[in-house]
Amino acid sequence: MEVFNLMTNQNKPYGKIASGKRNSKKRYVTYRKTNKRKAQIPPEVKESVRIAFLGGINEIGKNMTLYEYGNDMFLVDCGLAFPDADLPGVDLVIPDFSYVERNADKIKGIIITHGHEDHIGGLAYLLKKVNIPIYATKLTIGLIKGKLEEHRLLNSAKLVEIKPRDNITLGSFNIEMIHVNHSIPDAVGLAIRCPAGVIIQTGDFKIDTTPVDGDMIDLSRFAEYGRKGVLALLSDSTNAERPGYTPSEKSVGDSFENLFRKANKKRIVVATFASNIHRVQQIIDVAYARKRKVAVVGRSLENLVKVGSELGYLNVPQGLLIDINTIKNYADDQLVIITTGSQGEPMSALTKIAFGAHTKVTLSPNDYVIISATPIPGNEKMVGNVVNELMRHGVEVIYEKMYDVHVSGHACQEELKLMIGLVKPKYFIPVHGEQKHLQKHAKLGEAMGIDKKNIYIANIGEKIELCDDKIKLVENVPSGEVYVDGIGVGDVGNIVLNDRKHLSMDGIIIVVATIDSSTGQVVSGPDIVSRGFVYVRENEALMNSARDLACRVIDENYNVKFHDWNAVKSGLRDELSHLMYERTKRRPMILPILMEI
């Protein structure tokens, strides 16, 4: 593993990098790896810059964008998405890297805007295809290291640490990192400069005037670029439907203080997003003030606390954290348990606790559970099931509909309008959202005075060109979804998924028979095995009918001379499927297994 720090003169990074801070008296320092030639003057005739959307458009998750100028390319983010219910057995969904692989020699690196899964979760899979330098802030690098270590890629990775207001040069591009507020520290937006002009990509952001860490979004840099002229703005659309402003993260801390006071003699359990360091910090602060010890449950949360503490993003008083195995040594009013599972995930710690499946935490009526999150669309039923189960155990449960225990990390309408007003782009491209979010954000752009013809709602896979007078669709590049199932990547396609759906709906019937090749007679079987279709002992008449039918089909279709197995198997599938539907109105999968002796 090669890790570079921009403020030292050791381990010089892969591109030209200038480092600077707000209100810093340090000089900007420039490093070059080996190339000592003078910078070439851009030609008078400019090319147009092109953008390819490989993920994060018309969907939530697997964000990935490619920028191209001349023969130079670079990537922004490489995330994952979690599978919908119609993808049985699939663990993760990542972008299609075909276009990236095809242009591997042109790609100068990848910049990661922040450490959420939908922005870093696909990195390990990308690096197995193309090993390019990764540029990210300190915390994001820390989280990426954990991902790469799991895939045994850490030693070969090229990681370059960057900070807000640093500038990096990747071929024809010079990119400045701009600090933004989000639900994880160290998030940045990008000012992307090339001979064609300046493009601002906000990344995930909100405008928090009272951030927990005291570091407000760098609006002055966005405004400065707006004064100089911006060719295009790519802006976060997640909350484009929500009017007003997103509340400050600090307001959740105030809610925690009130709720912890009310809990008094009870044991407090707080479920939140594992990546929300500011939320975890506020829980720790209130627990410390109430003289309670804190235990952490859930692998991802444990990792976040470890990385956040080591890198200085979490301030944990000495002796406050205790091992989950020791919680029985403390009275209920001396404990706070922070856990994963705010989305009701089936294998999460909170779900296991609720259903009595957790080996270390057992519920009691004296527990006080706070779910500090809003259900992601599609997760409402799972969260509801967990809440109901907790309440069946006599546990008092507090969630967002009852109390202000969560705020979003994304900008609402007034913040989005402010960003547009500061940047004043010629072209506006809403990103990071479903179609409804992109459309609503586009309307906000129109309301802020951007010409409708200069607003472009992209589709995944489109490569566009920012021309002098319009945005032009150049081509559609390979894109879409690649499914990760266990250690398999991309080996689960529509055929496999259709089989899984078929099995999940009507089950399977397996027909096993042994045939004498010289006579064509069935010498063993047919045996009928049913899984997920009917309970055999209660349907013996149906199974006997299936056996008789299988014998007849084999006799009629098996040809001693030609041994046409396909005809026999096709006949078995057709006839048995007809029988099963006639008797049960179900269509199980029919799988014939024929052996010849």
Regions found by a protein language model. Name each.
Residues 26-111, 116-330, 348-362, 381-385:
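His/Asp/Glu-rich metal-coordinating catalytic cores
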Residues 242-372, 376-425, 429-562, 569, ...:
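Hard-cation-handling environments
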